[in-house]
A protein has these predicted regions:
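Active-site-adjacent structural elements that line small-molecule/cofactor binding pockets in enzymes
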Residues: 1-211
Length: 211
């Protein structure tokens, strides 16, 4: 984050870390007002985001933990006297096709989730091993079959379009979340699939959108 701030400000930057490093790097098109948002899971990442970043993306977080994450982020940002943007990203599940896509998306997220999250949904070590094995041999489509349907509602907004809209807005208001972000689709789905997702979401909220 420190290196990015220097680069965006147009400075010449040296950086060293465990996984990469560079010398005399510079961005000719740097913008000093560029906002830096982090994303991740677990208390260490949220603490880092609250202390150093301009915002944080809470992606596919167990919904019972949203309040605690937001509170931790706000407290850390307040301690450093900064404006802070909190973004929530997850799927809107209103059809059987959505449910299957959510199971695919969770197949590569759940195995690396914190132990407390696995305990909350009743996911065992055996489940973790089986899903990872399925991912290695058949990718998300194969692993999705091992993601139990009862796990899904803990991470997504699920129900009728009206219920999903009401739940999203009430959750954001209760937790103090600033923005909602649709999750990215696989590259193979193409631009039209992304446009369809945006249009459908706009319809759920009674809005108009040009894609």
């Amino acid at each position: 984050v420190g290196a990015l701030r220097g680069l965006y400000a147009g400075e010449e930057v040296d950086a060293d870390s465990e996984s990469f490093g560079f010398r005399a790097a510079r961005l000719e098109y740097g913008r000093a007002d560029m906002k830096i948002l982090l994303a991740g899971r677990g208390p260490r990442m949220t603490d880092l985001g609250g202390r150093l970043a301009d915002g944080f993306v809470l992606s596919w977080v167990h919904r019972d933990l949203l309040d605690d994450h937001v509170t931790s982020l706000r407290l850390a940002a307040k301690a450093h006297g900064r404006q802070f943007t909190i973004v929530w990203s997850t799927m809107l599940v209103t059809t059987d096709a959505d449910l299957w896509m959510a199971r695919e998306s969770l197949s590569f997220r759940l195995p690396d989730s914190p132990a407390v999250v696995k305990e909350m949904i009743g996911m065992t070590e055996g489940d973790t091993v089986a899903i990872r094995d399925a991912l290695r041999h058949g990718g998300p489509p194969a692993a999705a079959r091992l993601v139990r349907e009862e796990w899904v509602p803990h991470f997504v907004l699920m129900g009728s379009p009206e219920a999903v809209a009401d739940e999203m807005l009430s959750t954001m208001a209760r937790c103090g979340i600033d923005e909602f972000q649709l999750p990215s689709l696989p590259a193979a789905a193409g631009a039209e699939a992304a446009a369809t997702s945006i249009r459908r979401t706009a319809e759920i909220f009674g809005a108009e959108v040009a894609c």
